[in-house]
Amino acid sequence: MKIELNRDQIKYIAVFTMLLNHVANIFLQPGTFACEALKDIGYFTAPVMCWFLVEGYRYTRSVKKYAGRLLIFAVISQLPYYLAFARNHLAPWYTLNMIFTLFLCLCLMIAEEKILDPGKKSLVVLGIIAVSSICDWAILAPWYTLWFYRAGEDPKRRKKAFFIAALVLGITVTAELPGAAGIAAGAGAMIAVLAAGGCVLVFYNGKKSQKHFLVKKYFFYVFYPAHLVILALLKI
């Protein structure tokens, strides 16, 4: 019997892997096996969220409401993000949380669709990617979004997009640690992205959960700032 996962189930997995990544960053010693392993597992989250952002953009009834929801919860989440990361010297004080990054990724898709002039489009897209450098999931999340968006419905292009995403992240992570540790961390990061690709390209049934729709719709938006507050309090 074929294993199937709906959108919400995949998002729950992504939320859990994000939590593991945050626990590793906040509480564990950098460079240790446990820390790097949990961080690598957490690399599953960004491509999944970018994938469903692309899907959400394509099927939402109102892009304005979608963007507004992202922006509102990005603002709500900023203080919890600061308390969990910047206050603990894990990110510069001005770093914006990943919901801001997703908002920028949504803006990127709007530009990709609405701006017809290739030159202007390239400038705006590159500008949005540059702005993301002060956010969590900097640079990479906008590229993920762009690759997934441009892949459209073509299965081969979708697989290629995930392979490129895995390769780029693997190289990036490998460069952060010396020698064998860097290679191992990079390989783990690549596996996480490829696992994300497997979830959405192989096991995703294209459906969302029909039960408690409103609760599940806002679960991630509420969980994100709430878990950051809890982690920040535990770190005190």
Indicate where each model-derived feature is located:
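Alpha-helical transmembrane segments and their immediate juxtamembrane cytosolic regions
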Residues: M1-I236
